[in-house]
């Protein structure tokens, strides 16, 4: 009898764990391949060039989030409150609204490439680099929207297959453009753009194939847009603060020091990006949809669901802390034999960066209940506090401790962000 109860109790986690493992293995494979390519590019790019590439790539990640004005985030929050037919209509409306907003903005940016270059890249990028980065920013919405649908539906295998396919395209294009044709930074940007264009094209094919009833209509589009903007608006500053918390320190480092330090720090943060792809991304594709579905089903009281969620969080953070510490020691031993000498010092900052990501992982658990209850303004406030703290500490600590000051500031800010989310989740029950 006890065995039957135990099996019934834990069987609900089987599909979630399976989806997590599929996404995690796929992400590990993806990041493993791209990491090898990145290490090889270190022998081609100087730290200053690597720093410039890092700045451009961060812009390519950040600008699309502003470009969609919170539409994709609004879609995520609405998805679990609608049935299948309403979800399809929601996708159609969001695509139409996005096109009406994004096309004029992209056109304006293309006409002011030089100004954008001086603001974002301190005038060190070229016009073609900015042009391709803007095209990437426009296309990314469609690829991410499709991947979001797959994550919400917990279709981990298809999601992982697409990721691996995109990674292989990136690798092939990097080999052709960077290592063979030797066109430098712009080759990496083109390779990244080709990979998301592949996902966007497959998403469009699936969109047409799945009887989505695609159409262009203005029927009630204004009222729908208003509702979605109100729902998604807090995500716009929220995205800005999230970016400041995770990546804004690179701009402060570039402003206070030089591109060489940015390149060293960017290489250290690749360990954090690996953690993001192998742990955080699979969580967003498996555990978070699982939790949101569990809240929506209302089969158990919220306090009981949160009690188990909190238990999962603490155990996961402890285990990851141990694994990160062991992995860092291993990296310190083998890193000097793999990396070019000019990049070896980047290994000194890896442990601090990864510990910050572990606390950030904790917020994934805490914020589930806040996301389900659509408490976007609460999340915005917590993000604003943590991001502001990060910037202030960066300006205070970088002049004193250099890159160490940058990593310590980010770690402290992640700890603060975790604490605020944990407190907010307790109040939400």
Placement of each model-derived feature along the sequence:
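Signature of the first transmembrane helix
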Residues: 15-72, 109-110, 136, 167-171, ...
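Interfacial segments at transmembrane-helix termini and the short loops linking adjacent helices
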Residues: 16, 113-133, 310, 328-358
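Helix-loop junctions and terminal segments of transmembrane helices
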Residues: 67-83, 152, 268, 272-306, ...
